[in-house]
Amino acid sequence: MASSQQVNLLSCENVSKAFGERPLLRDVSLGVSKGERIGVVGRNGAGKSTLLRVLAGAEPPNSGRVTRGASVVVGELDQVGTSAEHATIRSHVLGDRDEHDWAGDSAVREILTALLGGFQSEQLDRRISDLSGGERRRAYLAEQLIREVDVLFLDEPTNHLDVEIIAWLAAHLKGRPKIAIVTVTHDRWFLDEVCDHMWEVVGGNVEEYVGGYS
């Protein structure tokens, strides 16, 4: 939970969400403030991903409301990821940024190198549809890390990543302390390394704890 002395970048009030007759969230009220690192845990099917999607604005709640500051920018990595059928890595990850702009940005080059193996034309001009599942996942993650956001929602960000890249990702996120991060992951090491708060989704409620997973 955000400190009473901190202003929430994003919050939900009395949010409920169900699929069919099955309630996943019941009257949940939470807030996310600048720089918080929150891990979302719970049993499979408890509603962890649903909570992230509702907070990110990807799904509407059945009742209650989600609010964010007028200038707050949100990024989201979901478990699936989508892109235009013929989009290239370049267009999907870098958008319409001029090459001289991103190529001169050491942070962008680091992300492209760590996740995509480099930023040469033959690498960036590959189609997303031609990539393996793991390569697509890394491309979607690179897109979110390159964006300038205030709150970043990550749903199973370590899926399809090897241990070296997971370690790089943890260090990268720790090196960007101004971004608030809310992540669902089964990777206990990642939770302990990155997160300082836990939200446990249990029976439609969200219980909050200070500290990492362990």
Residue ranges of predicted features:
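ABC ATP-binding cassette signature C-motif
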Residues: 1-214
